[in-house]
Amino acid sequence: LGELADAAAALDWLQRQNPNTNQCWVSGFSFGALMCMQLLMRRPEITRFISISPQPNLYDFNFLAPCPASGIMLHGKKDELVPVEETQRLAQKLQSQKNITVEYEEISGANHFYDNEVHKLNKILCSYIEKELNSRFR
């Protein structure tokens, strides 16, 4: 996939710009969530992921067995493109794996694009990132 090669090239560039970092997070929205998770499987230096509105109804996520890093998945309860149950199932599958923690949040009132609900998405993401960063530096 050209998109995956682009994501890998972007990650390479970021790592060259930040050679002394001890963390590497990836994030993606919708189709980008698929790219983020595929990159996660190919790059062992990735320590966390954020997957926003993945599309397990359109794409096969079975390659995430086992998933090598902890992270969070978010989904709008009023998503008109991806049934909430599909993402719930994917999250449950990942949550059952050992040695990782996968959080799952549904955002009330949010559609696939979080129209008029971006503030809720931002609040959850900021809280998760702060919690994870603080736990790594205790």
Task: Give a label for each model feature.
Residues G28-C36:
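Gly/Ala-rich beta-loop-alpha elbow adjacent to hydrolase catalytic centers
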